[in-house]
């Protein structure tokens, strides 16, 4: 038998090694800016184990530095899992005066029974999130909301907020959970059946997001037909994921930055109204189905749908 020995030149081996290190660095450091902000936060962070049935879900919890009781926000992560950005977003909301509970919905599904942080890369996390059982996700979110209701520093109001995949889950959770005070949906689709929804739903969408944008007219029609409160804004010039991309120092799209700033202002205004209002509900109130498109530099509503 003829055997051949392949000798790889040292220069090529060094190049391949450098390339591997570079790719690994890009993957692992993609959210280093979010991690740095999180580590610099003065707020109290903790992980809690949420139990339901035979399952345990780890949740990241952040407390604001305020006096008095405040609403609790259940934050639902993107399709990438509970990343440093998701936790940094939770901390940002806490900085504005809200308790935030962010469950890791990949708890127990990672390598060695771990969660989001145990996956080797983004693709593996995306695949795992995509494979999650929808009913199991709702059960995990129920555990998070049940915990939120019992937090002594909470005022009894809970709201859900989700991004990307989590945006769709926030909408679905509103159709599942009757005691939500509000649901905030960032670039996520609506559920197949909106009739059980009992809380007002607020949508935040990107103008340059054809996949999700194509679902919005159907959602508007369904919410209107069911007599539900649904208030939405589409931010022209922004792409899917603008809340994360808009604060990423490496982002080069000005539309994402503008959309994030304005969406954050809107979100905080709505949360502020929630804080000062009695328990919100879609039951027994006059339904409102309206929205607008927000141009990159100005926002001028014109009825239920405003073109810029």
Q: Locations of the language-model features?
A:
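An N-terminal hydrophobic leader/cap segment in hydrolases
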Residues: 15, 20-50, 57-60, 299, ...
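Serine-hydrolase catalytic machinery in alpha/beta-hydrolase-like enzymes
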Residues: 34, 38-41, 46-150, 244-252
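Short beta-to-alpha linker loops that shape the active-site pocket of alpha/beta-hydrolase fold enzymes
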Residues: 105-109, 189, 238
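Primarily recognizes the serine-hydrolase "nucleophile elbow" in alpha/beta-hydrolase
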Residues: 141-198
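Short beta-strand/loop motif that positions the catalytic acidic residue
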Residues: 203-205
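Acidic catalytic loop of the alpha/beta-hydrolase fold
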Residues: 208-213
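C-terminal catalytic histidine-bearing segment of alpha/beta-hydrolase fold enzymes
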Residues: 224, 229-308
């Amino acid at each position: 038998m003829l055997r051949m020995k392949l000798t790889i030149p040292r220069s090529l081996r060094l190049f391949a090694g450098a390339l591997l290190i570079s790719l690994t660095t890009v993957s692992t450091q993609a959210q280093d800016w979010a991690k740095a902000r999180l580590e610099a936060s003065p707020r109290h962070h903790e992980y809690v184990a949420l139990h339901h049935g035979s399952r345990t879900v780890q949740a990241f919890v952040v407390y604001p530095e305020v006096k008095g009781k405040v609403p609790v926000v259940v934050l639902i992560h993107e399709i990438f899992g509970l990343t440093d950005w998701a936790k940094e977003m939770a901390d940002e909301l806490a900085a504005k005066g809200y308790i935030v509970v962010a469950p890791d919905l990949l708890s127990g599904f990672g390598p060695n029974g771990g969660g989001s942080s145990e996956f080797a890369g983004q693709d593996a996390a995306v695949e795992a999130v995509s494979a999650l059982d929808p009913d199991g996700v709702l059960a995990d979110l129920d555990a998070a909301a049940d915990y939120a209701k019992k937090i002594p520093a909470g005022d009894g109001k809970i709201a859900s907020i989700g991004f990307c995949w989590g945006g769709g889950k926030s909408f679905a959770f509103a159709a599942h959970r009757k005691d939500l005070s509000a649901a905030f949906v960032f670039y996520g689709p609506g559920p197949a059946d909106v009739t059980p929804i009992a809380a007002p739903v607020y949508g935040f969408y990107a103008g340059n997001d054809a996949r999700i944008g194509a679902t919005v007219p159907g959602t508007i029609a369904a919410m209107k037909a069911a007599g539900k409160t649904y208030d939405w804004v589409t931010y022209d010039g922004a792409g899917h994921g603008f809340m994360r991309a808009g604060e990423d120092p490496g982002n080069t799209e000005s539309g994402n930055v503008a959309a994030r700033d304005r969406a954050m202002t809107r979100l905080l205004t709505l949360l502020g109204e929630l804080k000062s209002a009695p328990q919100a509900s879609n039951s027994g109130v006059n339904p409102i189905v309206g929205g607008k498109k927000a141009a990159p530099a100005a926002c001028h509503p014109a009825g239920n749908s405003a073109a810029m």
